[in-house]
């Protein structure tokens, strides 16, 4: 019995291995639009796909970021300025893409732009949550809906960058909320547009060293949020908690990997494979920590986080 089971698992693994290595033909004729290309995953993916001969349309937030990217790539790659929080910017970028892809349509849309704030929910105001959701979720949704007719024409791919924290909410501050939203939107979109031959993939990176996970920026944002809280909240948590919380964030960022290609290789596979995965867990922590944690009973996860987390001054 066990021998048959092992044989079946081995056969399934072998079939999956060969199936996932089938590559889409004529990649050099296919256009891919990527948001958030100033730095990090988007920047590396743009250069990676350009080296592969694909037609990369890279959206950057700043002209400086766009210029630096163009200097590192071939003449095939084109850039456009895009602020995903502004409708007029999205409309202009969509028209720009439409003029370039023509009747071929857009093969790949990669929603990569994002920001991050880790903090206690009680320290935030409504607008603090809104700022994160505008970029990470609502901006992504608006870009997708705007570009979708072009992707449908090419029977292409939508690749949305979520996070391992879109599976397990380890902290407050709006980031996890936005990534849970990315997961839900991507799942519903995948089912809706599968009828048109369009595939949707979700990338769930673990900890990687990018501008989003920069310790100095994160600690500064935490201190800024602490300063705006009421005296009552500060008394409940106290300054020692703040210091310990920031140290915990530093410990988390110190474990981040420098090898961004682990993530961009997943993104590239989602765009170029004949049979892309629905979800990609990128990184050892994503596979060995966050993914198993997401399947554990809630009470067990809560207990683990309770005993391992920093405690407020007035904790019971």
Swiss-Prot record:
The active site is at 175 (proton acceptor). The keyword 4Fe-4S does not apply. Pathway: Cofactor metabolism; retinol metabolism. NADP(+) binds at residues 33-57. GO terms for molecular function: all-trans-retinol dehydrogenase (NAD+) activity; catalytic activity. It comes from the Eukaryota. Highly expressed in liver. Also expressed in lung, eye, kidney, and brain. Its main location: other. Its EC number is 1.1.1.105. CDD domains: type2_17beta_HSD-like_SDR_c (cd09805). GO terms for cellular component: endoplasmic reticulum. It catalyses: all-trans-retinol--[retinol-binding protein] + NAD(+) = all-trans-retinal--[retinol-binding protein] + NADH + H(+). It is found in: Microsome; Endoplasmic reticulum. InterPro entries: NAD(P)-bd_dom_sf, Sc_DH/Rdtase_CS, SDR_fam. GO terms for biological process: retinol metabolic process. Pfam families: adh_short. Gene3D superfamilies: NAD(P)-binding Rossmann-like Domain. Acts on androgens and retinols, i.e. has steroid 3-alpha- and 17-beta-dehydrogenase and cis/trans-retinol catalytic activities. This is Retinol dehydrogenase 7. It comes from Mus musculus (Mouse).
């Amino acid at each position: 019995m066990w021998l048959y089971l092992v044989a079946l698992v081995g056969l399934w693994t072998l079939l999956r291995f060969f199936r996932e290595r089938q590559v889409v033909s004529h990649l050099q004729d296919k256009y891919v639009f990527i948001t958030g290309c100033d730095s990090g995953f988007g920047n590396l993916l743009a250069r990676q796909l350009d080296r592969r001969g694909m037609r990369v349309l890279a959206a950057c937030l700043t002209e400086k970021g766009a210029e630096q990217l163009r200097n590192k790539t071939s003449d095939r790659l084109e850039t456009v300025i895009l602020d995903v929080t502004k409708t007029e910017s999205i409309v202009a970028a969509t028209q720009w893409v439409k003029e370039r892809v023509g009747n071929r349509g857009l093969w790949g849309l990669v929603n990569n732009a994002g920001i991050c704030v880790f903090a206690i929910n009680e320290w935030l105001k409504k607008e603090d949550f809104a700022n994160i959701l505008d970029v990470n979720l609502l901006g992504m949704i608006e870009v997708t809906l705007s570009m979708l007719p072009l992707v449908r024409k090419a029977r292409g791919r939508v690749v949305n960058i979520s996070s391992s924290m879109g599976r397990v909410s380890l902290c407050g501050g709006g980031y996890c909320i936005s990534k849970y939203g990315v997961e839900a939107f991507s799942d519903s979109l995948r089912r809706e547009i599968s009828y048109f031959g369009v595939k949707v993939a979700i990338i769930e990176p673990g900890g990687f060293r990018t501008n989003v996970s920069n310790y100095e920026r994160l600690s500064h944002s935490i201190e800024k949020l602490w300063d705006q809280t009421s005296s009552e909240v500060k008394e409940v948590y106290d300054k020692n908690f703040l210091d310990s919380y920031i140290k915990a964030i530093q410990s988390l960022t110190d474990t981040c990997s420098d090898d961004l290609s682990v993530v961009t290789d997943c993104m590239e596979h989602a765009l170029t494979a004949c049979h892309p995965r629905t979800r990609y867990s990128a990184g050892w922590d994503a596979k060995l920590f966050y993914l198993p944690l997401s399947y554990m009973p809630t009470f067990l996860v809560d207990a683990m986080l309770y005993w391992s987390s920093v405690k407020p001054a007035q904790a019971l």
